[in-house]
Amino acid sequence: MSRKKTRVTGVDALAEAFDAVNHADLLERLGVDIDRDLLVLALTHRSFANENGMLPNNERLEFLGDAVLGLAVANRLYELYPSSPESDISKMRASIVSRYGLADIAREINLGEFILLGKGELLTEGRSKDSILADTTEALLGAIFRQHGYEVARDVVLTLFHHKINHASAKGIHQDWKTTLQEELAQRKKPMVEYQTTSVGPDHDLLFTAVVYLGDVEMGRGEGPNKKLAEQEAARQAFLKLREKRA
């Protein structure tokens, strides 16, 4: 009689999941080494931690990374825009370090493939969720700060966010991406897009996901705490995809 295989949990499950992926590419994209223990912690989402014996997760590192990111971006904007009032550079910073801005950076370094997620998140495409990508990016910055100090962490921020920082402007922070997309399509004599929006979660904490279609083709996908913001992000993604095709 064969015995049922015992499910690996706890630190053994953590080590097994972490070692299943080669992290060399990620570290190369970051341009810095991170100790194994810190890197494991930075990549451990609470869903994985909770499903494997309440292991430590990356939320404390995320807290640190958020502070490092905010200071590094704020100081750089202060230097780049000496004549801009506080209200403008504050809006610029908010746009750059937003969930969407962080998720963009995470996708550029293919961070999603390295995040340790629980089964529930894996089944709901957690590796592509803006919220998870953004939080893990901050956790990595927190890990870099803990190991190397502020100056190294700042340099990583300025390298990763170089384009966003140098092209920031107060104008366009609250851009209506749905209108921008509509105008771009009109110029190309393309048909209008359609939006499909769904929501999950309890009434007090709903997460909306919007998908924008051009005919039968998905052009963009966005998340947000309400339908409007989710559709705006989906429209932004669609607009960027159109621009890439034209480039």
Swiss-Prot record:
Annotated compartments: Cytoplasm
Cofactor section: Mg(2+)
GO molecular function terms listed in the Swiss-Prot or TrEMBL record: double-stranded RNA binding; metal ion binding; ribonuclease III activity; rRNA binding
Domain DRBM: 176-244
EC number(s) stated in the UniProt entry for this protein: 3.1.26.3
Keywords: Cytoplasm, Endonuclease, Hydrolase, Magnesium, Metal-binding, mRNA processing, Nuclease, RNA-binding, rRNA processing, rRNA-binding, tRNA processing
Highest taxon of source: Bacteria
InterPro entries, A to Z: dsRBD_dom, RNase_III, RNase_III_dom, RNase_III_sf
Sites where the protein binds Mg(2+): 62, 135, 138
Span of domain RNase III: 23-149
Residue positions of the active site: 66, 138
Listed GO biological process terms: mRNA processing; regulation of gene expression; rRNA processing; tRNA processing
UniProt keyword annotation of Phosphoprotein present: no
Catalyses which reaction(s): Endonucleolytic cleavage to 5'-phosphomonoester
GO cellular component: cytoplasm
Principal localisation: cytoplasm
Gene3D superfamilies attached to this UniProt entry: 3.30.160.20, Ribonuclease III domain
Subunit structure: Homodimer.
Stated role: Digests double-stranded RNA. Involved in the processing of primary rRNA transcript to yield the immediate precursors to the large and small rRNAs (23S and 16S). Processes some mRNAs, and tRNAs when they are encoded in the rRNA operon. Processes pre-crRNA and tracrRNA of type II CRISPR loci if present in the organism.
Family label: Belongs to the ribonuclease III family.
Protein name as catalogued: Ribonuclease 3
Source organism (scientific name): Corynebacterium efficiens (strain DSM 44549 / YS-314 / AJ 12310 / JCM 11189 / NBRC 100395)
